[in-house]
Design a protein with these regions (language model features):
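Conserved small/polar residues in nucleotide/adenosyl-binding loops
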Residues: 234-235
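Solvent-exposed alpha-helices and their adjacent loops that cap or buttress functional pockets
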Residues: 12-18, 24-25, 70, 79-86, ...
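Conserved phosphate-binding catalytic cores of ATP/NTP-utilizing and phosphoryl-transfer enzymes
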Residues: 6-11, 70-80, 207-217
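Glycine-rich oxoanion-binding loops at beta->alpha junctions
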Residues: 1-18, 65-66
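Internal gly/pro-rich beta-alpha loop/helix module
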Residues: 38-51, 55-139
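Hydrophobic/aromatic beta-strand patches that form the interior of the parallel beta-sheet core
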Residues: 22, 60, 89-93, 191, ...
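Accessory alpha-helical/coil subdomains and C-terminal extensions
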Residues: 85, 89, 113, 117-207, ...
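Short glycine/serine/threonine-rich phosphate/pyrophosphate-binding segments
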Residues: 30-34
């Protein structure tokens, strides 16, 4: 992922006002595009992510830190494209629990936030607050805490790209509906449990297992064989 990011950045740096970037991204793209700012090594960025995931922080809190130490995420790839005077059209497959079903994919998405091709809704202060809240000063790599404490306004991520156009082509409710149809075509009873689940993987795994045991033992909320569909954002 790191080498690919360097190639993408090199491509952007050779662009000009006559160029158009078509970006197609799905949930998890930012996790694959690891490219830390100067002064922070890839190893330190990876260590930071691991510590954050084990800290009990929520996904937005984690992203606030990760985005502010990245050359790609937090909209910084899009900012780099804008700095070259080029145009960006983005197509997004969303894994966010907050997005409603897609009504018409031909209508631009006016309130798109996403990394690395869209503006960032987190702030540098959010990143610093996360470190303070979970007492991570002594646990995170010194290069990370030093950068976040000293970067100032120049280290803030971009908050708007009015010149760009974004399209939402799929959301969690869309995926749930498609999975339900596919299961029913196979002759299974299909139930969408939720598209709003957020939390830690171990907790969600325990929850799903308990529901499966309930079905096996007491045939509720539906009798087997069945398909239980749950789309979530877990970490």
């Amino acid at each position: 992922g790191y080498e690919a990011c360097l190639e993408i950045l090199d491509l952007i740096d050779r662009a000009g006002p006559e160029d158009l970037f078509l970006c197609v991204m799905s949930g998890g793209s930012s996790a694959l595009m690891s490219c830390p700012v100067d002064g922070i090594s890839l190893e330190d960025e990876q260590k930071t992510t691991d510590i954050l995931l084990k800290s009990g922080a929520g996904i937005l809190e984690i992203n606030a830190v990760r985005r502010h130490i990245s050359r790609m995420n937090g909209g910084r790839m899009a900012q780099r494209i804008a700095d070259r005077g080029a145009e960006l059209i983005g197509f997004n497959i969303s894994d966010s629990v907050s997005n409603p079903p897609t009504r018409d994919i031909s209508i631009p998405w006016e309130h798109y936030y996403g990394t690395p091709m869209g503006p960032d809704q987190t702030t540098l202060q959010d990143a610093l607050a996360c470190i303070e809240k979970y007492n991570l000063h002594s646990r995170l790599p010194a290069s990370v805490t030093r950068y976040l404490a000293s970067c100032g306004p120049a280290g803030e991520t971009p908050k708007a790209f009015p010149q760009n156009t974004y399209y939402q082509i799929n959301t969690l409710p869309d995926s749930a509906a498609a999975a339900q149809r596919a299961a029913e075509q196979l002759g299974l009873r299909a139930v969408v449990l939720s598209t709003f689940i957020e939390g830690e993987a171990k907790d969600m795994g325990t929850l799903m297992a308990s529901i499966a045991r309930e079905i096996q033992a007491y045939h509720r909320p539906v009798p087997p064989p069945c398909a239980l569909i749950s789309l979530s954002l877990i970490h």
